[in-house]
Amino acid sequence: MLSTFHGLEAARRGMMAQQAALYTTSHNIANANTEGYTRQRVQLQPTPPFPTPGLNRPNIPGQMGTGVEASSVERVREYFLDIQYRGENSKLGYWEARADAIAKMEDIMNEPSDSELAKTMDQFWQAMQDLSVNPENEGARSVVRQRGLAVVETFHYLSNSLTQIRTDIGTQIGTTVTEINSLLNQIRALNERIAEIEPNGYLPNDLYDERDRLIDQLSQYMEIGVEKHPTGGNALPMAEGTYDVYVMNGSAKVYLVQGRTASVVSFPDGSDVDGDGVKEMPPASGVNTLDVSGTTISFTALANGKLRGLIEGYGYQTGTDASGQPIVKGLYPDMLANLDKLAYTFGTVFNAVHQQGYGLNGSTNHPFFDGISAVSGAANTIKLAADTDDLANIAASTKSGETGNGNNAINLANVRSLLLSNATVSLQDGISVNLASLNLPLSSGTVETNYQGWIGQLGVDGEQANRMKTNSETLRQSVEEKRQSVSSVSLDEEMMNMIKFQHAYNAAARQITVIDEMLDKLINGMGVVGR
């Protein structure tokens, strides 16, 4: 037989369950603008009916419901959308870093403009043409020297500026690695707290949110994967457990966070600039590998992410040359190497022609440029030869004693269009240059077309980076909108829920009033006769 107070207990349970739902709704509304917050909902389930099956069960028709209970408060989140978002976030981080590095390089190269290298060299070639018309004119000779000095200074400016930006990118890499290690440690700490709470049968939803927010941030720097591991004990079935975060090194997983342990990311050949024992700064020779708490991973294992984009700008090693020196590739190392090749080739070929000509005083074998004994660093070391201090030594003539002969000035102006693939180049008045014997680093095209090709490729790379950045941003935004449609707080929806739960609460309270009136009639209104 049912208890007289059975209805009171069922109504009380209804009030408590609806109250929990109202409190959760209040929590959602309060955090509507909190970054990373996932809306929560109370899972309601009926309590076990009465009676339970057994030999001594009361003889009543069927089982009677006993009310409702809040089984859990859980997040409304779709894990698959998290995976999609983090993948797109990694791609966006990579293309943002690459686009930024190229944009800074384009600002330095400043093509086309009146102060860039191509324009400066055009003015130098034009000065040589003018000198060929007036080889005896001291003003024309002075202009040639000044234009040559402008070319040298432009090489220096470009080389120094690109080197400085590369250094700045290296500093940015160090800051990024420090931030990555900080995020890993914070995720580890959250894993610890979650592992202490879940076995007691609770869902630490706010800790889950904070952990997911940190992993979202981490995905901007590196392409990562996440594995879930149960914490055991009395954890609820929907408990998310601890997260293991990893990167792929080929087909092997390298764990950045594993339960309550966080790895440290560093550069084996790098330097520790803040004294914390972590080599967060990349080596000056370029990145070869990364160290993850003793596990070495290749730079190429970083498929996407801001860190890879920065390293590609800064420079990475691809092996060693015949002398055992590392071969460094990357946006800035490549452009610096190209400028060195250009400065060396330009200066060497120009000198080879100039030294065969004659000055006003009949002297010959005077170099015009100096400081180009090696290809490496030539853009920073090239300078005007001391012989050019005497303007009479500028070799505009192809014949000794013919001061009005400007044919060698024409030869010098034609250096801009010499095909570097030719073994030997013949010029006016029997002057020729054996290009094959000069061991030039550029062996195709011309001095001019090589530079134009590099600038053109820079423009193409910049356009591609900006296009991919825009595409990645659009895709990430699309996934984020889907994720927000599932997980974010809708104030309109919460207001409807509030009204729904309020009415249910009021109905349960009214039920108690009804039962109270029934009991009052039973207790106080029965068994009294004659009143």
Label for each model-derived stretch:
Residues 1-531:
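Structural signature of extracellular appendage/secretion-system components
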